[in-house]
Amino acid sequence: MSTWMMFMFQESNSFYADNLVSFHNLVMMIIIMISTLTIYIIFDLFMNKFSNLFLLKNHNIEIIWTIVPIVILLIICFPSLKILYLIDEIINPFFSIKSIGHQWYWSYEYPEFNNIEFDSYMLNYSNLNQFRLLETDNRMIIPMKIPMRLITTSTDVIHSWTVPSLGIKVDAVPGRINQLNLISKRPGIFFGQCSEICGMNHSFMPIMVESTSFKFFLNWINKQN
């Protein structure tokens, strides 16, 4: 989760988040290199007292500054498309979880497990042992290293189910069902919040995901039944 004075991404807890962080590092490296070169050229032009008044055109330079940006854009394009398709493609999920947005709480359903369902409300943050505006009364429990499908929709306005450390952000739109892959690579508790302004209490509908071992997950399922 995010902490004070944290300027980078949260620690990634899924393979999709790993890919997104790597892609971000690649793009940032390219941006820094281009920005440094541009600043150097501008500074050099201002400091240089010499100028060539007879240089009106140069085909070699024009070819270079046309080809180089194309190559850079392709370097950015291919990893981006790969990550988008990896996140969007649903391949043999072990089971599905439904996430339903309401004003202003989330509901979760496990249709393959005797249709387990429950609501998840934000807890009162008067307890100092809790994270302010992030703790919920019921957590979404998932097994780690198991591919799942997250299905989300809304009953009223547009919400957005977002857990940054899992690399997930999907809109919950009324009358529409969106889906994407969900997988956690380690046990832990991951926090998120609705990321679509949805009304007065938009800031008070947190998301709390607990990733556990498969054995513990089955025990939790049995207790719910």
Swiss-Prot record:
Q: What class of enzyme is it?
A: translocase
Membrane topology (Mitochondrial intermembrane): 1-25, 83-225
Q: Name the positions where Cu cation A2 binds.
A: 194, 196, 198, 202
Q: Which family does it belong to?
A: Belongs to the cytochrome c oxidase subunit 2 family.
NCBIfam families under this entry?
CoxB
Membrane-crossing segments per the record = 26-47, 63-82
Q: Which positions in this protein are listed as binding Cu cation A1?
A: 159, 194, 198, 205
**Single biological process term from Gene Ontology:** ATP synthesis coupled electron transport
One MF annotation (Gene Ontology) recorded for this entry: cytochrome-c oxidase activity
Q: Which residues lie on this side of the membrane: Mitochondrial matrix?
A: 48-62
Q: What is its EC number?
A: 7.1.1.9
Q: Where does Mg(2+) bind?
A: 196
Q: Which gene encodes it?
A: COII
Q: How is the cofactor bound?
A: Binds a dinuclear copper A center per subunit.
Instruction: Tell me if Cytoplasm is a UniProt keyword of this record.
Output: no
Q: Which species is this record about?
A: Apis koschevnikovi
Instruction: Spell out the SUPFAM superfamilies in the cross-references.
Output: Cupredoxins, Cytochrome c oxidase subunit II-like, transmembrane region
List the keywords (alphabetical). Copper, Electron transport, Magnesium, Membrane, Metal-binding, Mitochondrion, Mitochondrion inner membrane, Respiratory chain, Translocase, Transmembrane, Transmembrane helix, Transport
> What is annotated about its quaternary structure and interactions?
Component of the cytochrome c oxidase (complex IV, CIV), a multisubunit enzyme composed of a catalytic core of 3 subunits and several supernumerary subunits. The complex exists as a monomer or a dimer and forms supercomplexes (SCs) in the inner mitochondrial membrane with ubiquinol-cytochrome c oxidoreductase (cytochrome b-c1 complex, complex III, CIII).
Question: Could you tell me where this protein is found in the cell?
Answer: Mitochondrion inner membrane
- The organism's superkingdom is given as Eukaryota
- Name this protein carries in UniProt: Cytochrome c oxidase subunit 2
A Gene Ontology cellular component where this protein is annotated is:
mitochondrial inner membrane
